[in-house]
Amino acid sequence: MAVVPIRIVGDPVLHTPTSPVPVGADGSLPADLPELIATMYETMDAAHGVGLAANQIGYGLRLFVYDCADDRGKAAHRRGVVINPVLETSEIPENMPDPDNDDEGCLSVPGESFPTGRATWARVTGLDAEGNPVELEGSGLFARMLQHETGHLDGYLYLDCLIGRHARSAKRAVKSHGWGVPGLSWLPGEGPDPFGH
């Protein structure tokens, strides 16, 4: 296990749909998958993220880890992994997102956040770390996280979901940081935290 660099917007691995994690006829998962999952958790924790998709650290495989609050109560918090997730959502609003309630950030767009329209409810089905079926659903931040991480695995970032002035602001931010090109990354725990944690 180790904290590894997180790829920044513009890296081709972030803009390419991931491949399903192979599952054996007996339901077995690849022998090296636990090590990848542990690395993903450690990297997400070091970055203070609520989720991390495998392609954000350079692996084109369909899985993500999460550590996210949900709306089931003040202390409700969920942590886990979803392998080969399939997403289902309520309708995504067509109106302009609310800057006060719909702000979203991403570890692959360090230090930036923009209002992003998302469905208020989401469910993901897939497999857990042992290859057992798992189903997660939620609303609020948890639903946003499920949509965000599954989007990564489908080859797009939340920036691709932005509309209007928010999309224009994001393009300016990417350009001003010199992002949008292959090969850029940042290492959580090294230098200033781009999110101010």
From Swiss-Prot:
Key words, A-Z: Hydrolase, Iron, Metal-binding, Protein biosynthesis
Keyword Iron: yes
Gene3D superfamilies: Peptide deformylase
Gene Ontology annotations of biological process type: co-translational protein modification; translation
Record: active site: E149
UniProt: Fe cation binding residues: C106, H148, H152
Enzyme Commission number: 3.5.1.88
Cofactor note: Binds 1 Fe(2+) ion.
Needed cofactors: Fe(2+)
InterPro entries per record: Peptide_deformylase, Peptide_deformylase_sf
Entry's Gene Ontology molecular function annotations: metal ion binding; peptide deformylase activity
Top EC class, one word: hydrolase
Known catalytic reactions: N-terminal N-formyl-L-methionyl-[peptide] + H2O = N-terminal L-methionyl-[peptide] + formate
HAMAP family: Pep_deformylase
Entry function: Removes the formyl group from the N-terminal Met of newly synthesized proteins. Requires at least a dipeptide for an efficient rate of reaction. N-terminal L-methionine is a prerequisite for activity but the enzyme has broad specificity at other positions.
Family classification: Belongs to the polypeptide deformylase family.
Protein name per UniProt: Peptide deformylase
UniProt source species: Mycobacterium marinum (strain ATCC BAA-535 / M)
Organism phylogeny: Bacteria, Bacillati, Actinomycetota, Actinomycetes, Mycobacteriales
